[in-house]
């Protein structure tokens, strides 16, 4: 539908069963076509930690990925009003993918001085999924989930909503993508990787 042809990204989270089997995270990048020629998948070999593969654009350090310790990350840009000096998200993603344990991956985001807001969706090989909504100076963590969940480019946590920039023209499109993804996820009895495509 033409209603969804606006740049942005949407993440999907599907919790697994009690053993963690079937847990999934996914993301689409509805970016301007100008980025298509710069899209790359990179394998990073690390002597001091896990190797990782990640999706990014040429010149960036990483936007989404998975390491060989089973830690995965996808992201959604958020637009808080408290941006300032701090660590930018590509370095956060690299810190997440350098982690061996999910708790360390969470700390790679929450224990650092952040430059701005981002939504980080983390998952490990045991099926643990954590959604980290952040601003430069605050955060909220969602886990466990009551079924599948979607996230786009606006804050979902009530406590963080006042931090969102007031004059942000793409908010409506973000709400639209989030609503559509949420409805589609709820319409599938047990979402799997094929259904998320």
PLM ranges: what are they?
Residues 1, 5-10:
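Active-site pocket-lining segments that scaffold enzyme catalytic pockets across diverse folds
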Residues 1, 16-24, 28-197:
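C-terminal, well-structured catalytic/ligand-binding subdomain of enzymes
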């Amino acid at each position: 539908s033409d209603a969804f042809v606006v740049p942005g990204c949407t993440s999907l989270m599907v919790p697994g069963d009690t053993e963690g089997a079937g847990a999934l995270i996914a993301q689409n990048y509805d970016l301007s076509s100008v980025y298509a020629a710069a899209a790359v998948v990179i394998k990073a070999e690390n002597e001091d930690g896990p190797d990782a593969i990640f999706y990014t654009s040429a010149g960036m350090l990483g936007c989404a990925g998975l390491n060989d310790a089973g830690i995965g990350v996808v992201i959604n840009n958020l637009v808080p009003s408290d941006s300032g000096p701090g660590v930018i998200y590509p370095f956060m993603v690299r810190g997440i993918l350098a982690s061996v344990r999910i708790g360390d991956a969470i700390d790679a985001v929450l224990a650092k001085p952040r430059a701005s807001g981002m939504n980080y969706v983390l998952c490990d090989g045991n099926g643990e999924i954590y959604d980290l909504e952040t601003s430069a100076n605050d955060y909220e963590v969602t886990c466990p989930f009551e079924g599948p969940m979607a996230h786009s480019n606006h804050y979902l946590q009530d406590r963080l909503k006042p931090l969102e920039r007031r004059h942000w023209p793409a908010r409506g499109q973000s709400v639209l993508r989030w609503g559509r993804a949420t409805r589609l996820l709820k319409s599938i009895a047990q979402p799997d990787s094929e259904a998320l495509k």
